[in-house]
């Protein structure tokens, strides 16, 4: 007869009318009983012949791809001008006095952040924007391109101008100013009727131009002239020390050469102003040029700047038609849906490319991307705005993966010990937190995103994947991309983007100037940054508890009035550092804080209501006696595992599911096991804050017997059959808890101390979790354990009772720096463990 739910509860000793614990509990460690129960509950029968179920409620399993939904009405979020102050350490020190070594180290890590993987795979530009929405390809292309443009304008991205130069918007940092052009010297030389450009800019690392002027350039370094050198100092080489110039045969056009206006510009201003002046010069120089893409013989996409035959060419003569978009202007419409109709809507489509306010030199950057991008909803609650997803997963996969640094995240018990108090709470919203942290320009070649331009994108998606060579093709080739779909999409997009359609149809390569969300290093850097800032805030405002996890920052104070005044001061302090807060999203929680998916109050911690609701819905839709695909089980365990610490039996109750996931088999829920889990998750118990105290109850065991020391009394007992030592120690701890009711027990067994009961026999693990719930353990060495003698059957011998103090654990999260640590005379090493003591105790 199958095991009923009531019998199963009695078996697990979850009901009060069970027999004496010393007899009942060791029985649960019996292998035979565990096997019989598993068979009764159908837990071990993983090989099933019935087809697997691949969907349970919202959880999808194998062979199902969740198709993201494209929203044609997506708005691109606006980004404030985020500029984290470079002298953040000095500013903090002015505010709070000298910083600890730990805080300084963390803040130096992000000023600027560095990211240099061993190996970077470069992907063709076609893979820049992922074809996630084939039905809305063109719309997705322009929305993504607009998002990237917005990020560039906000100073979050660099734009690759040439192989060795990039431009950006926003305020430059000192490490960027060192790389700016000190001086710009243009010289035009005319010989043998061959007019060519000879650019001698000290910042843009263009390849040597073509023509007779090359000879004079051979003496120059690849890096160009330095600001302090003479305006035409020929013989000296620059920083690189190597004199290498690539000479192109005169017949070929030069790629990536910086174009110059006629005449000579010699600007001796400071680097910043020269940089601004230069960008203005570059704009005029570029205004009559157009950039396009062309497939070179090696199949690489190369930027081609078509230089007009005369440098003094008047701008009124119109653009040179190498631009795919503008070529339609001079062509006859091929049909009613020809793009010519759209191009003729406007007289002035604006420039082909835009250039940033500042220019810097960068390491050699190919015309490639290292990760694809696509758009999704900003979050489940906000589907009107889009979010850019950047896929830099190449750095986390395969043989070339980078192992990211580990950092301390408080576990549930530590979090409860830290934050469970009768304080009043509010949480701050840091807007675009990742985009606060600047990246060194040398990391740019590893973090490239971009697009190959509209024609290539459309050609790749069209059924006849023609290799469009629109540089030397006929006009007919140009019209190959005309189609009704493209025409209708562009007409609708014209209402949104206007003349920007032209700009966005061009290829572009962008590198990250601030840390991207998709980089494996980013969470670590963000955690270091916010935890250092909170540490400074706690010292500056001793009566305030500031705590952060990633971009979630919470402030706690004794009263609401106190909290409000602290909020004003702290907000001003953070704004002075350049940290952008979103005042509309500041949440005031009262006395129960919502943080990291938990509700934390003076009574302890529970999961948030929406998670409890999700679990209830999940059980409602969970089928019985039907094999469920292990991928669905994995998602199920993710949800149930989050709330497991709040149930009677905890994680051990989920062990059968873990086993099925590990063996990649289907799992069949029997009615009893489902009812058991259902009841477990319907009644959730808070995880309470641990209290410090003196330990006066000790437990110890040998494979054959157990012993307890409760105050001055001693007890002992024997097992019917010898047991593994860890099992025996766990049983002894359970007996100590049940007999004394103490919440503090001393043990010499590390497994019992760790409170992870998933490796024990299943039934015993479940029962022990319930008996020992809310118990804290203190380690006592075997030699000093007063329960050691009784466990060996010696009751007459009394070891002195130890007074073992217990301090609640806060993991590696230090909440308060009591004093500045004395500098040691040892060589400075980077520590990740916090040397600070936790002096703050929750009230």
Curated annotation (Swiss-Prot):
Report any Pfam family annotated for this entry. Answer: DNA_pol_viral_C
For the site labelled Priming of reverse-transcription by covalently linking the first nucleotide of the (-)DNA, the residues are: 63
Q: Name one GO molecular function term.
A: DNA-directed DNA polymerase activity
GO terms (BP aspect): DNA replication; symbiont-mediated suppression of host innate immune response
Biased composition of type Polar residues is found at 268-277, 287-299
* Stretches assigned to the Reverse transcriptase domain: 357-600
Q: Where is this region: Terminal protein domain (TP)?
A: 1-177
Q: Where is this region: Polymerase/reverse transcriptase domain (RT)?
A: 347-690
Catalytic activity entry: DNA(n) + a 2'-deoxyribonucleoside 5'-triphosphate = DNA(n+1) + diphosphate; Endonucleolytic cleavage to 5'-phosphomonoester
**Looking at the record, which segments are called Disordered?**
224-243, 253-316
| Inhibition and activation profile | Activated by host HSP70 and HSP40 in vitro to be able to bind the epsilon loop of the pgRNA. Because deletion of the RNase H region renders the protein partly chaperone-independent, the chaperones may be needed indirectly to relieve occlusion of the RNA-binding site by this domain. Inhibited by several reverse-transcriptase inhibitors: Lamivudine, Adefovir and Entecavir.
Segments crossing the lipid bilayer:
none
- What EC designation does it have? 2.7.7.7, 2.7.7.49, 3.1.26.4
Region Spacer, residue ranges: 178-346
Alphabetically list the UniProt keywords: DNA replication, DNA-binding, DNA-directed DNA polymerase, Endonuclease, Host-virus interaction, Hydrolase, Inhibition of host innate immune response by virus, Inhibition of host RLR pathway by virus, Magnesium, Metal-binding, Multifunctional enzyme, Nuclease, Nucleotidyltransferase, RNA-directed DNA polymerase, Transferase, Viral immunoevasion
Which residues of this UniProt protein bind Mg(2+)? 429, 551-552
* InterPro entries hit by this protein: DNA/RNA_pol_sf, DNApol_viral_C, DNApol_viral_N, HBV_DPOL, Rev_trsase/Diguanyl_cyclase, RT_dom, Viral_Replic_Matur_Polypro
Q: Which family does it belong to?
A: Belongs to the hepadnaviridae P protein family.
Q: Beyond the main fields, what else does the record say?
A: Hepadnaviral virions contain probably just one P protein molecule per particle.
Entries under PANTHER family matching the protein: PEPTIDASE A2 DOMAIN-CONTAINING PROTEIN-RELATED, POL PROTEIN
Q: What does this protein do?
A: Multifunctional enzyme that converts the viral RNA genome into dsDNA in viral cytoplasmic capsids. This enzyme displays a DNA polymerase activity that can copy either DNA or RNA templates, and a ribonuclease H (RNase H) activity that cleaves the RNA strand of RNA-DNA heteroduplexes in a partially processive 3'- to 5'-endonucleasic mode. Neo-synthesized pregenomic RNA (pgRNA) are encapsidated together with the P protein, and reverse-transcribed inside the nucleocapsid.
The domain-related comment in the record is: Terminal protein domain (TP) is hepadnavirus-specific. Spacer domain is highly variable and separates the TP and RT domains. Polymerase/reverse-transcriptase domain (RT) and ribonuclease H domain (RH) are similar to retrovirus reverse transcriptase/RNase H.
- What protein name applies here? Protein P
């Amino acid at each position: 007869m199958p095991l009923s739910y009531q019998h199963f509860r009695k078996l697990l000793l979850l009901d009060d009318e069970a027999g004496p614990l010393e007899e009942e509990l060791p029985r649960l460690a019996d292998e035979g009983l565990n096997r019989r129960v598993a068979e009764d509950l159908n837990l071990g029968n993983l090989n099933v012949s019935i087809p697997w179920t691949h969907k349970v409620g919202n959880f999808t399993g194998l062979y199902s791809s969740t198709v993201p939904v494209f929203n044609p009405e997506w708005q691109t979020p606006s980004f404030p001008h985020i500029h984290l102050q470079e002298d953040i350490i000095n500013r903090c020190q002015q505010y709070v006095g000298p910083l600890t070594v730990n805080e300084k180290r963390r803040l130096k890590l992000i000023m600027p952040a560095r990211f240099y993987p061993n190996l970077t795979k470069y992907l063709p530009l076609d893979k820049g924007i992922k074809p996630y929405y084939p039905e809305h390809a063109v719309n997705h292309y322009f929305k993504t391109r607009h998002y990237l443009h917005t990020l560039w304008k906000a100073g979050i991205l660099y734009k690759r101008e040439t192989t060795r130069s990039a431009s950006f918007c926003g305020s430059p940092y000192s490490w960027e100013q060192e790389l700016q052009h000190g001086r710009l010297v243009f010289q035009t030389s005319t010989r043998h009727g061959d007019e060519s450009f000879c650019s001698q800019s000290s910042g843009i690392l263009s390849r040597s131009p073509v023509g007779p002027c090359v000879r004079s350039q051979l003496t120059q370094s690849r890096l160009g002239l330095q600001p302090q050198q003479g305006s035409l100092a020929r013989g000296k080489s620059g920083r690189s020390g190597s004199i290498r110039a690539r000479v192109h045969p005169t017949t070929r056009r030069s790629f990536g050469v910086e174009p110059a206006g006629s005449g000579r510009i010699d600007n001796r201003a400071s680097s910043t102003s020269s940089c601004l002046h230069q960008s203005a010069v570059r704009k005029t120089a570029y205004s009559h040029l157009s950039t396009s893409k062309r497939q070179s013989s090696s199949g690489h996409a190369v930027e081609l700047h078509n230089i007009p035959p005369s440098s003094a060419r008047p701008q009124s003569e119109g653009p040179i038609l190498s631009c795919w978009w503008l070529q339609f202007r001079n062509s006859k419409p091929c049909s009613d849906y020809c793009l010519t109709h759209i191009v003729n809507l406007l007289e002035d489509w604006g420039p082909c490319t835009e250039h940033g306010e500042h220019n810097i030199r960068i390491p050699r950057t190919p015309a490639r991307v290292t990760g694809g991008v696509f758009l999704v909803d900003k979050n489940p609650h906000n589907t009107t705005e889009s979010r850019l997803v950047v896929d830099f997963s190449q750095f986390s996969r395969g043989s070339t993966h980078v192992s990211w640094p580990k950092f301390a995240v408080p576990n549930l018990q530590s979090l409860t010990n830290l934050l469970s108090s009768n304080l009043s709470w509010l949480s701050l919203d840091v807007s675009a937190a990742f985009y606060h942290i600047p990246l060194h320009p040398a990391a740019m070649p590893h973090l490239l995103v971009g697009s190959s331009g509209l024609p290539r994108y459309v050609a790749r998606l069209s059924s006849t994947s023609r290799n469009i060579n629109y540089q030397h093709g006929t006009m007919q080739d140009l019209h190959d991309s005309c189609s009704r779909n493209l025409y209708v999409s562009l007409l609708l997009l014209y209402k949104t983007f206007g003349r920007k359609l032209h700009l966005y149809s061009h290829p572009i390569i962008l590198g990250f100037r601030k840390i991207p969300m998709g980089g494996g290093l980013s969470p670590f850097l963000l955690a270091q940054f916010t935890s250092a800032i909170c540490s400074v805030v706690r010292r500056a405002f001793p009566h305030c508890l500031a705590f952060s996890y990633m971009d979630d920052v919470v402030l706690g104070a004794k009263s609401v009035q106190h909290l409000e005044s602290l909020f004003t001061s702290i907000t001003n302090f953070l704004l002075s550092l350049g940290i952008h807060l979103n005042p509309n999203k500041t949440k005031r929680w009262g006395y129960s804080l919502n943080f990291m998916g938990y509700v934390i109050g003076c009574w302890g911690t529970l999961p948030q209501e929406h998670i409890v609701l999700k679990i209830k819905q999940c059980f409602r839709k969970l089928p019985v006696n039907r094999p469920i695909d292990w991928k669905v089980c994995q998602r199920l365990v993710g949800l149930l595992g989050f709330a497991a610490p709040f149930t009677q039996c905890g994680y051990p109750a989920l062990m059968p599911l873990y086993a099925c996931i590990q063996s990649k088999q289907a799992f069949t829920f029997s009615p009893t096991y489902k009812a058991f889990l259902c009841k477990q998750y319907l009644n959730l118990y808070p995880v309470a804050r641990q209290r410090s105290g003196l330990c006066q109850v000790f437990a110890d065991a040998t494979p054959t017997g157990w012993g307890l020391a409760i105050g001055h009394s001693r007890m002992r007992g024997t097992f019917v059959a010898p047991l593994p030592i860890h099992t025996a120690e766990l049983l002894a701890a359970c007996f100590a808890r049940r007999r004394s009711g103490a919440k503090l027990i001393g043990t010499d067994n590390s497994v019992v101390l760790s409170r992870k009961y998933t490796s024990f026999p299943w039934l015993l693990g479940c029962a022990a979790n319930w008996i020992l719930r809310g118990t804290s353990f203190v380690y006592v060495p075997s030699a000093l354990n007063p329960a050691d003698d009784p466990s060996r059957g010696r009751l007459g011998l009394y070891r002195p009772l130890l007074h073992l103090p217990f301090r609640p654990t806060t993991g590696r999260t230090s909440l308060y720096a009591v004093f500045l640590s004395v500098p040691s005379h040892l060589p400075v090493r980077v520590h990740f463990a916090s040397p600070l003591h936790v002096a703050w105790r929750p009230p």
